Swiss-Prot record:
Family statement: Belongs to the bacterial ribosomal protein bL36 family.
Keyword Oxidoreductase set for record: no
Pfam families: Ribosomal_L36
Record has Ribonucleoprotein as a keyword: yes
Full protein name: Large ribosomal subunit protein bL36
Transmembrane stretches, start-end: none
This protein's encoding gene: rpmJ
Keyword field: Ribonucleoprotein, Ribosomal protein
BP term (GO), one: translation
UniProt cross-references to InterPro entries, sorted A to Z: Ribosomal_bL36 (IPR000473), Ribosomal_bL36_sp (IPR035977), Ribosomal_L36_bact (IPR047621)
Superkingdom: Bacteria
GO cellular component: ribonucleoprotein complex; ribosome
Length: 40
């Protein structure tokens, strides 16, 4: 999992979902797990 300042480019990838967990914003991607990230 990467920590990124901006998740805008990742959320446009096919299969990406933006999820909020415990006050943090995550992008999870079941199709392409390389694009997992947390905003920070």
């Amino acid at each position: 999992m990467k920590v990124r300042k901006s998740l805008r480019s990742l959320k446009n990838k096919p299969g990406a979902q933006v999820v909020r967990r415990r006050g943090k914003v995550y992008v999870i991607n079941k199709k392409d797990p390389r694009f997992k990230a947390r905003q920070g």
